[in-house]
């Protein structure tokens, strides 16, 4: 639908159909929105989304790609967002087999008493999804590697690790890809 609107707009501005066709053919999508890399028998996905509705949709889409286990990795963003959308986050991970959460990115906000990453972990866990709280970002890739042999042995389908967040989590995803690729 977006391509149709872009093409129509281009034509109305006098851009040739051939130029539009070439442009659309070369478009590979938005970087870090469901960016998929297969490495070492694991599908690693990077997605910039941090709103629970979008995360729920990404996980539902990932579930259609493989019957293998899904591990979601999330760095919560802002006290206010986690506080006001806590109930939505609690159910957003229902299609994940496991969630790994690290410390909250505060974006300079004043803390809200009782609202923190362990609180969010409890909310998700209370909705039936296993959660691991890994406060140190440097420990996440090793933790994921320790999970993957057991989850990949559990089924014949490709396990998926989905990183939700921003640049620091994407660097972790790249580190996991590098380590899996050499495994």
Q: For each of these PLM feature ranges, what is it?
A:
Residues 1-98:
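Nucleotide phosphate-binding/pyrophosphate-handling subdomain across enzymes
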Residues 54-58, 84-85, 112-116, 172-175:
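Residues at alpha-helix caps and immediate loop-helix transition turns in enzyme cores, especially N-
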Residues 90-156:
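C-terminal helical cap/extension that packs against the catalytic core
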Residues 140-179:
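A glycine-rich beta-strand to alpha-helix segment
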């Amino acid at each position: 639908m977006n391509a149709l609107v872009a093409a129509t707009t281009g034509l109305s501005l006098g851009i040739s159909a051939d130029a539009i066709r070439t442009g659309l053919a070369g478009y590979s999508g938005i970087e870090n929105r469901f960016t998929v890399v297969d490495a070492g028998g694991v599908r690693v996905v990077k997605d910039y989304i941090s709103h629970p509705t979008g995360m729920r949709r990404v996980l539902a889409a990932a579930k259609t790609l493989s019957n293998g286990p899904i591990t979601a990795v999330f760095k919560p963003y802002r006290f206010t967002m986690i506080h006001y959308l806590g109930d939505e986050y609690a159910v957003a991970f229902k299609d994940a087999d496991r969630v790994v959460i690290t410390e909250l990115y505060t974006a300079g906000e004043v803390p809200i008493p009782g609202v923190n990453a362990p609180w969010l972990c409890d909310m998700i866990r209370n909705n039936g999804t296993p959660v691991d709280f890994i406060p140190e970002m440097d420990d996440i890739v090793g933790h994921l590697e320790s999970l993957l042999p057991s989850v990949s042995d559990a089924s014949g389908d490709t396990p998926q690790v989905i990183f939700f967040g921003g640049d620091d989590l994407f660097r972790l995803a790249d580190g996991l890809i590098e380590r899996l690729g050499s495994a």
